[in-house]
Design a protein with these regions (language model features):
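Core catalytic alpha/beta fold that binds nucleotide/phospho-ligands
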Residues: 1-217
Length: 217
């Protein structure tokens, strides 16, 4: 698999850089404050790409409910956040972009979630790898990124999608009749696992990765 001249830009920020909780606020208020802080940060980044002041009112939803900029259809974007990190993926050249980020120190019921969400092929690989945590995070973030890219989200059961994540590869292709073909690339950073996905068609010429540029703020 080789690189193309198509690009995906990824911005990663620590949540503590964009949000400081109000200690006097109750939990539900803090969650709402975090949501608004994330939206402001997203809008600021999108404004920089487009040289236009993006507001919440500019963000609409496509027929599948995926957030988009109807006034700027040339820019595809998707975002994700964990407890500690925020990530925004954007591209002017690729369609149906999706992203997921997970903290590697997240407390996870690995086996229970794998039994519930993994395709039988993924579950077998994970068991053969003696429940390797990195492989689990790669499968999980790939599922999330692909389903977010497709726009279907939870309308397609996680265990119906076989991502074909391979232990020795950092990306690949997957397909499901409901969503079509998607490609993805995994990035393991010291504190988090990040996966970017985008719509891709199989070709006799072979598959090519776009240039994915990650900026950590």
């Amino acid at each position: 698999m080789s690189k193309t001249d198509k690009k995906i830009h990824v911005d990663v920020s620590r949540i503590q850089q964009i949000f400081r909780p109000d200690p006097s606020a109750v939990r539900s208020e803090q969650i709402q404050q975090l949501k608004q802080a994330i939206y402001r940060h997203r809008n600021q980044l999108l404004s920089g790409y487009l040289k236009y002041d993006i507001q919440n009112s500019d963000i609409e939803r496509n027929p599948h409910g995926k957030p988009c900029l109807m006034a700027f259809p040339q820019l595809q974007f998707n975002h994700s956040h964990s407890r500690q990190h925020y990530a925004l993926a954007s591209s002017f050249e690729l369609s149906d972009v999706g992203i997921d980020i997970e903290d590697l120190d997240r407390k996870v019921r690995f086996d229970a979630l794998a039994q519930h969400a993994f395709h039988p092929n993924e579950l077998k690989y994970w068991q053969d790898l003696e429940h390797d945590a990195d492989y689990w995070f790669r499968v999980w973030t790939t599922k999330e990124a692909v389903l977010k890219a497709s726009g279907l989200g939870i309308r397609l059961s996680l265990n119906e999608l076989d991502t074909h994540v391979h232990p020795s590869a950092q990306g690949g292709l997957c397909h499901h009749p409901q969503i079509g073909h998607f490609a993805y690339q995994n990035f393991r950073l010291p504190d988090y696992m990040l996966t970017v996905a985008w719509r891709a068609a199989p070709s006799c010429a072979g598959f090519q990765f776009p240039q994915i540029h990650i900026v950590q703020h």
